[in-house]
Amino acid sequence: MDIFEMKFAKVFPLLIAKAERKGRTRDEVFKVTMWLLGYTKEELEALLESEATYGDFIDHAPAKNPVRMDIKGRICGIKIEDIEDPRMRDVRILDKLVDDLAKGKEIKQ
């Protein structure tokens, strides 16, 4: 199944779990997501209770941070800056930020 067709309520908790396994918190994952995509905590909570897809989550982000395009690195062996599909790039950027958070790296806002 395509990531964009999967339910947000199924995918996002996996990001939270990844961070929590390394001693980070749900609120820290929310904070990174809010910075990246412009959602409020309340909006993220509502999405977790909704039938929204992960594609909806990415496509309808209220305020994508333009600085996100400066984020570089690898996720799953793929260089983020080489990803041409803007939707997939945003997915991978969020994944990278959560990975960095889980590894204890400082997330510069």
Where do the protein language model's features map onto the residues?
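A charge-rich, low-complexity, intrinsically flexible signal that marks solvent-exposed coils, linkers
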Residues: M1-Q109
